[in-house]
Design a protein with these regions (language model features):
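Repeat-blade elements of multi-bladed beta-propeller folds
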Residues: 36-40, 75-95, 118-142, 166-190, ...
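Loop/turn-rich, solvent-exposed surfaces of beta-rich toroidal or solenoidal domains
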Residues: 401-402, 425-483
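Aromatic (tryptophan-biased) beta-strands that constitute blades/sheets of beta-rich domains
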Residues: 21-73, 106-115, 151-160, 202-210, ...
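Beta-propeller blade signature
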Residues: 191-202, 266-281, 334-335, 431-438
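Conserved blade-ending motifs and adjacent loop-strand segments that build the rim/top face
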Residues: 292-294, 299-302, 342-348, 377, ...
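N-terminal cofactor/phosphate-binding cores enriched in small/glycine residues
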Residues: 45-159, 461
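Structural recognition of the beta-propeller blade-terminating site
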Residues: 101, 146, 197, 277, ...
Length: 527
């Protein structure tokens, strides 16, 4: 296999020069057109493209351009948003990185990470700096590859292997910083965000997501031991404001996950949106969306950056539809709370909001030995699948789930560990694609999925189109009113965020489903 891949790489890449593979850093600061250079297309997290060659007037002519299967073993699922740089797609599955020709889907090279004991739940993709790619392995190594050949440049261990951390994050490259996150809350390990040098992999800074001794926030835990084992993992990439030089990232749930008796208090900085100085990792502000969270919901969903208008004044905003079922709108310069409102009507775990707009958890809905019925379910009202914001409609598009779980505590010890409980699905009132007014949190329209299902991935464009998927279709909606304009059948669900790009004058849409990439375009001449 290695010999075959090497020959394939050399043959397929003969027409590519090293300079041709280099990512122009300026592309990261622009709305994507002929590139998709970072996880969300640009730093804002909006997943909005200025392209409009494919538009509401001609989307009915969209057809399959190519499909390629990239299998590397049973059960492989591509959960990574592909990057597109200079005509090459880069994408991942756990332990695997591929490069493919964006014209036709032909594999250019395939890097396979050695067998390891890390979790293979998923991998969100690569980051890129110049000619180099970066991805996190399941056993928490940062690996750097040559983008032209797929050859490994170096790898560095991010954590002590004995601690059994896991890694799923797509690195985000900001200047000369490769910003990383971590997973593994089941092992009681402290969460962190860190930055490494793209040249060497050396650590530049590390910001823990639970407070150390002498740090602010420790008083929200019973003691230093509880905080040190409180996790707050950072398993999704964040967003970035280049004017403020702030990186925004959501943190995971506290630990023990379902048993709260050993961690009384708000448990900072779990289930929190953090704003970090990119140069130092210093916490500039924070907002906790779920104080003292007890249902395995996190705040890891994309913090979407919006330059909007509130009460007639321009504001730099941050919007998040969070896993706990609430929509939050903040001032991203200082964390000031502006809006909190539920985006599912089955939500039953909170008694109301406090003065800061934070939900007040109802102790009657905490997990207990005989179980308690709660909505949203353990997977949340939404989850990691990417939302999208269309600045032309002013709507945030989110996949929403109106489901229930029974939550149980199974470890009533004074100091439980790990999950310390279990949850079981307890039915659903359906799932929907929701269009949320960013200013108010009001649901402007929604499309109920007839077969139920859960949140899917979003992409909006200046062509007055919104793309997403359900259990086995790729679908285009009118973003203003939710009318279905086009759809194509797939062999399964959309498993990663769709992207769009222009290549040699033609616009393409690319999406992942299971172990394959599908590309769509309009093959007849575009008027």
């Amino acid at each position: 296999m290695k010999i075959r891949n090497t020959i394939l790489s050399l043959t397929a890449l003969a027409g590519f020069t090293a300079s041709g593979q280099m990512l122009d850093p300026a592309k990261l600061l622009q709305k994507p057109i002929d590139t998709w250079p970072t996880y969300n297309g640009d730093y804002s997290g909006q997943r909005f493209s200025q392209l409009k060659q494919i538009n509401s007037g001609n989307v009915h002519g969209l057809s399959l351009a190519w499909v390629t299967r990239f299998g590397s073993g049973p059960g492989v699922t591509i959960k990574s948003t592909p990057l597109l740089v200079n005509g090459v797609l880069y994408f991942t599955a756990p332990n695997n990185v591929w490069a493919a020709d964006a014209h036709n889907g032909r594999e250019l090279w395939h890097y396979q990470y050695p067998p390891n004991t890390g979790s293979t739940i998923g991998n969100r993709g690569v980051g890129m700096y110049g000619n180099w790619l970066f991805f996190e392995s399941p056993d928490s190594n940062l690996v750097s590859l040559d983008a032209k050949t797929g050859k490994e440049r170096w790898k560095v261990q991010m954590t002590d292997p004995k601690l059994d951390y896991t890694s799923t994050v797509a690195p985000i490259v900001v200047g000369n910083h490769v910003i990383l996150g971590i997973g593994g809350d089941h092992m009681d390990n402290p969460g962190f965000i860190e930055s490494r040098d793209p040249e060497t992999g050396n650590l530049q800074w590390k910001a823990y997501t639970t407070p150390r001794k002498g740090e602010p926030g420790l008083d929200t835990w019973p003691d230093e031991y509880a905080s040190a084992h409180g996790t707050g993992q950072t398993w999704m990439p964040g967003t970035y404001d280049p004017q403020l030089n702030l990186y925004y990232v959501g943190t995971g749930n506290p630990n023990p996950v379902l048993a709260e008796q050993s961690r009384k208090g708000d448990n900072l900085y779990t289930c929190t949106i953090l704003a970090l100085d990119v140069n130092t990792g210093k916490k500039v502000w924070y907002y906790q969306v779920s104080p003292h969270e007890v249902h395995d919901w996190d705040a890891s969903e994309t913090p979407v950056l919006i330059d909007g208008v509130i009460d007639g004044k321009p504001r730099k905003l941050l919007a998040q539809a969070s896993r706990n079922g609430y929509y939050f709108l903040l001032d991203r310069t200082n964390g000031e709370h502006l809006v909190t409102t539920p985006f599912i009507d089955t939500l039953n775990w909170a008694k109301g909001l406090n003065a800061k707009g934070q939900p007040i958890g109802d102790p009657a809905k905490f997990p207990r030995p005989d179980g308690v019925l709660v909505s949203p379910a353990s997977n949340g009202a939404t989850n990691w699948p990417a939302p999208s914001f269309d600045p032309e409609t002013g709507l945030l598009y989110v996949g929403a789930s109106k489901s229930y779980s029974m939550f149980y505590v199974t470890d009533t010890d004074d100091h439980p560990e790990g999950w310390a409980g279990l949850d079981a699905s307890a039915g659903t009132q359906g799932a929907a694609l929701e269009a949320i007014d960013y200013k108010t949190g009001k649901i402007v329209w929604q499309h109920e999925w007839p077969s139920g299902g859960g949140p899917s991935h979003m992409l909006s464009t200046a062509g007055k189109l919104l793309f997403t998927g359900n259990a086995n279709n790729f679908i285009a909606f009118d973003p203003a009113n939710g009318k279905i304009l086009w759809h194509a059948g797939l062999t399964g669900p959309v498993t990663a965020g769709p992207i769009t790009y222009e290549l040699e004058g033609k616009q393409y849409l690319v999406l992942a489903s299971a172990d394959s990439l599908f590309a769509f375009t309009i093959n007849q001449p575009v008027k």
